[in-house]
């Protein structure tokens, strides 16, 4: 059996991975995301970021055979512009104000790297999310909880911001941060039977 390593510090990703895998390791990637410039193709961009995270971790464990490293990156896009994690409360407020009464996309790139053979597979998932119309009071109250500060697009669907979501088209777990259905298929492609 292959040793599975998640290249992420995200507690949300760790919790989600536990739903399909009982045994895995966590090694946090030190990959510099700014080393990959965005060039208008969001799906390629998130897959390249996921690969960078997986390769960064694989370099730390080169002497160990039988490892598969999972890299993942999730981002929010609105009007073909990437909304990363907010810099401060004002930035979070402005992001949420822009998303109010609008549809946006959540992209996750996945990369699974077999450390021994250097074989890698990459894919992505895109989910459309529509927010209801939010008042300034709702946005400010949510921003003041601190919840949006470590999340792409300044919200977490699994938390208090879940009430902002009018509808979703696609994988819910993608919006949380780890598209389980796609990951499951990719792991099976790499020989992991779940």
Swiss-Prot record:
InterPro entries, from UniProt?
Answer: ITPase-like_fam (IPR029001), Maf-like (IPR003697)
Pfam families in UniProt: Maf
EC number(s) recorded for this UniProt protein: 3.6.1.9
Q: Which GO terms describe its cellular component?
A: cytoplasm
Site, as annotated: Important for substrate specificity: 12, 74, 158
As its record notes, the protein acts as a catalyst of:
dTTP + H2O = dTMP + diphosphate + H(+); UTP + H2O = UMP + diphosphate + H(+)
Primary localisation category = cytoplasm
Q: Which UniProt keywords apply?
A: Cytoplasm, Hydrolase, Nucleotide metabolism
Please give the cofactor(s) recorded in the UniProt entry for this protein: a divalent metal cation
Q: Name one GO biological process term.
A: nucleotide metabolic process
- Residues the record marks as active site: 73 (proton acceptor)
Listed GO MF terms: dTTP diphosphatase activity; UTP diphosphatase activity
CDD domains, per this entry? Answer: Maf (cd00555)
What subcellular compartments does it reside in? Cytoplasm
Which EC class is this protein assigned?
hydrolase
Q: What does this protein do?
A: Nucleoside triphosphate pyrophosphatase that hydrolyzes dTTP and UTP. May have a dual role in cell division arrest and in preventing the incorporation of modified nucleotides into cellular nucleic acids.
What family is reported?
Answer: Belongs to the Maf family. YhdE subfamily.
Protein name, UniProt field:
dTTP/UTP pyrophosphatase
Give the organism the record lists: Clostridium botulinum (strain Langeland / NCTC 10281 / Type F)
């Amino acid at each position: 059996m292959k040793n599975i390593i998640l290249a992420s510090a995200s507690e949300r990703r760790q919790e989600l991975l536990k739903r399909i895998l009982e045994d895995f390791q966590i090694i946090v990637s030190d990959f510099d995301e700014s080393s990959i410039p965005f060039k208008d193709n969001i799906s390629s961009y998130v897959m390249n970021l996921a690969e960078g995270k997986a390769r960064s971790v694989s370099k730390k464990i080169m002497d160990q055979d039988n490892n598969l490293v999972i890299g993942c990156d999730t981002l929010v896009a609105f009007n073909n512009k990437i909304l990363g994690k907010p810099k401060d409360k004002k930035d979070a407020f402005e992001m949420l104000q822009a998303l109010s009464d609008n549809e946006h996309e959540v992209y996750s790139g996945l990369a699974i790297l077999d450390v021994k053979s250097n074989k890698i597979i990459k894919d992505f998932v895109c989910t459309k999310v529509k927010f209801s119309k939010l008042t300034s009071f709702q946005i400010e109250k949510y921003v003041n909880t601190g919840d949006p500060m470590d999340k792409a697009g300044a919200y977490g669907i699994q938390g208090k911001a879940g009430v902002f979501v009018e509808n979703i088209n696609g994988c819910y777990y993608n919006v949380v941060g780890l598209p389980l259905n796609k990951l499951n298929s990719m792991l099976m492609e790499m020989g992991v039977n779940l």
